[in-house]
């Protein structure tokens, strides 16, 4: 159990370090970023399908954004500051397709993270996931936007 906690601490550190790096010269940070790591291979998880939903007034989940992780396991540019308003969001990772592409039969169909965003004013969110075929762990880094 202690090694698992240490691993989660290392994952949080990795997210912090990736968040500290610049996305591009002069580019503003995106308000929502996803980072996915493969715990089996010890590497970024590339080409993981990501869907983001926003909870509507009628309690249904409406599609908000989508994409695939890059070779670095990251997905930037999902939304803009103007569109990423206060609300309940769900990030869904297509873990089944990822593991199947590697010839592995996974337990989970997908991994999801549901969170409230921007309820205390504008924030930037990095959602990080650590995947294995039979488990997943998530963490988040929430920071104030930089001017």
From Swiss-Prot:
State the Gene Ontology BP annotations: negative regulation of glomerular filtration; phototransduction, visible light; purine nucleobase metabolic process; retinoid metabolic process
Q: What does this protein do?
A: Thyroid hormone-binding protein. Probably transports thyroxine from the bloodstream to the brain.
Carries keyword DNA repair?
Answer: no
Q: Provide the binding site for L-thyroxine.
A: 35, 74, 137
**From which lineage does this chain's organism come?**
Eukaryota, Metazoa, Chordata, Craniata, Vertebrata
Q: What is this protein called?
A: Transthyretin
Q: Kindly indicate where the leader peptide sits in this chain.
A: 1-20
Coarse class of the primary localization is secreted
Q: Which of UniProt's keywords are assigned here?
A: Gamma-carboxyglutamic acid, Glycoprotein, Hormone, Phosphoprotein, Secreted, Signal, Sulfation, Thyroid hormone, Transport
Check the record and name the Pfam families matching this protein. Answer: Transthyretin (PF00576)
């Amino acid at each position: 159990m202690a090694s698992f906690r240490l691993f989660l601490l290392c994952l949080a550190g990795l997210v912090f370090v990736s968040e500290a790096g610049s996305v591009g010269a002069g580019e503003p940070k995106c308000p929502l970023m996803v980072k996915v790591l493969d715990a089996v291979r010890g590497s970024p998880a590339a080409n993981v399908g990501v869907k983001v939903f926003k909870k509507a007034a009628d309690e249904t989940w409406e599609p908000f954004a989508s994409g695939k992780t890059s070779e670095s396991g990251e997905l930037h540019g999902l939304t803009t500051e103007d569109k990423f308003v206060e609300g309940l969001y769900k990030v869904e990772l297509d873990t089944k397709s990822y593991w199947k592409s590697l010839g592995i039969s996974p337990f989970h169909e997908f991994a999801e993270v549901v969170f409230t965003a921007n309820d205390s004013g504008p924030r930037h969110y990095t959602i990080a996931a650590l995947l294995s075929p039979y488990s997943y762990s998530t963490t988040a880094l929430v920071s104030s936007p930089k001017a």
